[in-house]
Every structure is written in structure tokens, then in C-alpha cells.
UniProtKB/Swiss-Prot annotation:
Organism: Bacillus subtilis (strain 168)
A Pfam family annotated for this UniProt entry: SMI1_KNR4
Signal peptide interval: none
Record protein name field: SPbeta prophage-derived uncharacterized protein YokH
Amino acid sequence: MTNFVHKTVNGLKSLLDEKGAIQLFCSEGDIMEFLVTFSPDKATLNDIQSFEAKHQLSLPEDYQKFITLHNGAKIFEILSDGENIGGGLQLFSLEEIEEELKYEDLFEGINGIPIGYLLEECHLMIDKDKINQGDPNYLYIFESGLEYNPLNLNFEIFLDRYILANGEPFWDWRYYTAENYYRTR
């Protein structure tokens, strides 16, 4: 498998201004400004191996590549009149994943590792069962602590598409047809 996560990250970084901001063309003609920050910290091989041993799993190769580049990131936080008002995708560092896992009640019955947070109410999850089965489609969205839905993607394809879609929930687009699109607005 070819890893291109570094190309996706570097491509996005090349478009940012000196403050880490970017203007994007969004849905229905809106132009919005977003902030993108990548952690300067990098996970070491030792960090990854310790995490894997503790949680009895092997982190996917594409995800490992990302955290060895940047152990965490915030992508497409909304800037309103220059002020960061949140939103976007937060990719957790290994330490932040450990903090998230302390909320056992939230993840009860879910055999996954939360690697990020998005849409103000969803966790991006690596499904441990899929990893153990060698299934490359291991990413799930855990919505509001209720629904655990497969994305049928790996990390680098998710990240690439998320950036291509300017932070829009591209995985829901198939549900919006010409018949129902306008009823949701």
C-alpha cells in the first residue's frame, strides 16, 4: 500500500498563510476563513509501540505515518472576523487519546480507539476489530455517543477527502439528492 498522508499534509500546509489561515470556497458559494494548526511534536517509534502494547493493537501504517509527522492537529477551525470560534477536525495526540479513553462510559460497547473529534459531536474512531481482521476500511464515526457508523475508509483517504471537501462531511453527501437537498436547508 502506498502512503500519501505526508503529501496531503504538506499540500495543505503550502496553502496556509503565515498565521496558519486559509480562505476556502464552501458550499452554496460561501467563502470562509479557517485556521489549520499541526502539532510540532512527533510521536516516536517508542511512543507508538508503548501505546500499541497498552491497548493490544497495531496502529495502521498510514495513521502511524501521520503521528510521526505531527502528533495531533486542528484542521479547519472557523475564523470569524479573525477570531477562532472552533469547529473543524481535531486529530488527537497519543496523549489526548489516552485522556479520551478515560471516559469509559462514552465508549462502552465500542471496540475502538478515538483518534479525533469533529462536527462538534462526533468522534473519529479506529475500529479494533477491523484492524485485527486486516480490513483496511477501519475508520468509523461515533456520533453523539449513540451511532457507530462505518466510513469504509482508512485514515489517509479520510484525511485527503476531508481536506478536499474543505471540512464538509463528505460521507453524508450521498444522502442529499435533488429531491431532498432543499428540505434540509
